[in-house]
Amino acid sequence: MATPSMMPQWSYMHIAGQDASEYLSPGLVQFARATDTYFSLGNKFRNPTVAPTHDVTTDRSQRLTLRFVPVDREETAYSYKVRFTLAVGDNRVLDMASTYFDIRGVLDRGPSFKPYSGTAYNSLAPKGAPNPSQWTNQNKTNSFGQAPYIGQKITNQGVQVGSDSNNRDVFADKTYQPEPQVGQTQWNINPMQNAAGRILKQTTPMQPCYGSYARPTNEKGGQAKLVKNDDNQTTTTNVGLNFFTTATETANFSPKVVLYSEDVNLEAPDTHLVFKPDVNGTSAELLLGQQAAPNRPNYIGFRDNFIGLMYYNSTGNMGVLAGQASQLNAVVDLQDRNTELSYQLMLDALGDRSRYFSMWNQAVDSYDPDVRIIENHGVEDELPNYCFPLNGQGISNSYQGVKTDNGTNWSQNNTDVSSNNEISIGNVFAMEINLAANLWRSFLYSNVALYLPDSYKITPDNITLPDNKNTYAYMNGRVAVPSALDTYVNIGARWSPDPMDNVNPFNHHRNAGLRYRSMLLGNGRYVPFHIQVPQKFFAIKNLLLLPGSYTYEWNFRKDVNMILQSSLGNDLRVDGASVRFDSINLYANFFPMAHNTASTLEAMLRNDTNDQSFNDYLCAANMLYPIPANATSVPISIPSRNWAAFRGWSFTRLKTKETPSLGSGFDPYFTYSGSVPYLDGTFYLNHTFKKVSVMFDSSVSWPGNDRLLTPNEFEIKRTVDGEGYNVAQCNMTKDWFLIQMLSHYNIGYQGFHVPESYKDRMYSFFRNFQPMSRQVVDTTTYTEYQNVTLPFQHNNSGFVGYMGPAIREGQAYPANYPYPLIGQTAVPSLTQKKFLCDRTMWRIPFSSNFMSMGALTDLGQNMLYANSAHALDMTFEVDPMDEPTLLYVLFEVFDVVRIHQPHRGVIEAVYLRTPFSAGNATT
């Protein structure tokens, strides 16, 4: 079988060029012949692009780069169209491969942008610790606070902080003193009076200290709200003094503590509440127990290679490259030509996509493999981890000295020993924390549990979330049950959590490419950007444009969901993101050739035997077939046609929600901004296919009955494998594994080996195939099995929160989940197997060289398909999903453009495509 690849066979459109000896200098021809044995040029100069051979760096070389300013702009709410006039002077050749659009504008990433995990404000505070606060109960003010500053005395003017040069008392400036960051510097001082601190009034709504921020209102850092005086001309701070003494005091009521109470502009810029008591009002004693959590990180940047920014489609918004003499447009795009995906796969074939290149915004979408597939090998916590008090002692008591009279009588020793000695008895006081287990548990919650499907999450009590589930506020407010994916779930196994298999793993804050692209723009919401965007359309991205005057125009989208990417995938339109283009210029390069060299090149390229031909790298008609929610079978019918030059099928599955309508410049139903597999190649639903059958309209089976399984049917995975047809400790069949190795790497029945590195890059099947297995309790043979549901399971009880990320509750008690699968008391178990294969597309090769897909006979193969047309029926069996999806099929065809520039200012393009000549698979 011929090796299928994304490039079609060149023999279908051979480009006839002159022999090198006809136009290269005699010296170069002689050099080539003399060195041919060890430096072979081959037919390098038979290509339509002829390299300059002399006079390259002389004073007659042209200037390298020119800037073209648009002659016309047309801006709407959804797009920005620019038109350029490209004037290519005599003896010059414009290199379209080097052109790029230079775009300047302003980007507002919206309030949902959060480029970090955790909080920037009081991140060391316990999640449930309140700010020092006051509240009113039965018309009396209650205070809960801290007084860290120790002054010299307290009067009705407040706390004394020092003395001036005249030895007069200086009292705290209540606009900013006492400062909350200043207190006692030694652990061994335990003052009982003259203490001062700050506290928030009951008119400032309570919230936890974790994540609290109040802007300063003076240059000393004070935060008290400014209030206007009666004359409304000046503003002052309204800070009150609250004096206290001990509750047991009955006689001397001089103050021992003063709290400076104030109202501040309290905010929580990057946190939200996950526990809120049910009380009326914004200040109450119960609200001291509120608990905060950080807002979820949401990186927002332009898509990889600026996917979605330029508009590629033929329905009314087509790009234009036309000679002004002829006005024939060289750009003929088709609705089924996927320019963006083609460019992604081409870059992968050319080099290593894991290397980022900032100029073209090249930073490919990725995910942390430890998040997609969890290797839960437990934690190494053999040694306990302790924390100790600052004094490094146990709990101390006060002791006085005693002495003996050299006998058995003891008496008080107050002559040379203090009467107040702090002595601890026993071991040093300590508290233990299992750091390793807590870090692992926190990793699982932040990286996996919070990304569970929404149906697995809950809304905390007394928290109101918006109805629109695509908003950041809704996604951010929902919480997962930590015990659903705790350290003991699937412990010892390498397994992806089943609910996560169908969740887009690229919509994650560990998408390193998106994080890089987001950080290229900075860490603020408002960004004045200046970007360079390359042309990707295959017919013009490598074109040599000969002298003449040309019209070049293109549309740029302004839809933030299409041109921006967020790690949460929220609806950026609703969440307040916007983009404004201020200028779009075109930068173009001329070949640095001497004029006589350029004129020779022009004369050659004007000849129709040297027309420039370009292949679309993907070379495929791509079709989307809807799969309704919970459907398991997808039939496809292709009308009768000649299948010459057909190379096979590639297919995968997409979510309808994640696939925009490319036919319109603005898709109102595209309420999503995560990765778009249809355009960027972030496929992740390949594991949901069960089998596919291929039937041509004949009685002859294809691809023959010499395979392991049924002719006409490719079985992808088997749940029950009685015959042993599965492979690699998973449920993929040997048949399908061999077909993938054959179609991707030409590694067929001659044995198994690793494909060459240049074929095994980011979108490779071999690199992304991930088999896995685990054991679970056999509920039929284990007679004592009880189906204990999540609310009734307990493990780490008393040390963790219950059914949510809130404060720990309960008591220490033996765990009742999970059942042991190891050791002396291991319960009966079953083995489950599955696989994941992201990024790649399943492929079925079809060799149009054979043209005989019949059964093998002693007469050789039946020439059934040689020159006749046949219809095709395909049926895909898939796993049901609870949302509408799309079957994405690439019919690998032959897609070439041949560009002819016979005269000045004339450009003609001929597009050849077979077997799908027009824009869809029905013609």
From Swiss-Prot:
InterPro entries: Adenovirus_Pll_hexon_C (IPR016108), Adenovirus_Pll_hexon_N (IPR016107), Adenovirus_Pll_hexon_sub2 (IPR044942), Adenovirus_Pll_hexon_sub3 (IPR016110), ADV_hexon (IPR037542), VP_dsDNA_II (IPR016112). Pfam families: Adeno_hexon (PF01065), Adeno_hexon_C (PF03678). One of its GO terms (molecular function) is structural molecule activity. One of its GO terms (biological process) is microtubule-dependent intracellular transport of viral material towards nucleus. The keyword Phosphoprotein applies. It comes from the Viruses. GO terms for cellular component: host cell; host cell nucleus; T=25 icosahedral viral capsid. The modification Phosphotyrosine is found at Y911. Gene3D superfamilies: Adenovirus Type 2 Hexon, domain 4, Hexon Major Viral Coat Protein, domain 2, Hexon Major Viral Coat Protein, domain 3. Induction: Expressed in the late phase of the viral replicative cycle. Belongs to the adenoviridae hexon protein family. Homotrimer. Interacts with the capsid vertex protein; this interaction binds the peripentonal hexons to the neighboring penton base. Interacts with the hexon-linking protein; this interaction tethers the hexons surrounding the penton to those situated in the central plate of the facet. Interacts with the hexon-interlacing protein; this interaction lashes the hexons together. Interacts with host dyneins DYNC1LI1 and DYNC1I2; this interaction might be involved in intracellular microtubule-dependent transport of incoming viral capsid. This is Hexon protein. The lineage of its organism: Viruses, Varidnaviria, Bamfordvirae, Preplasmiviricota, Tectiliviricetes.
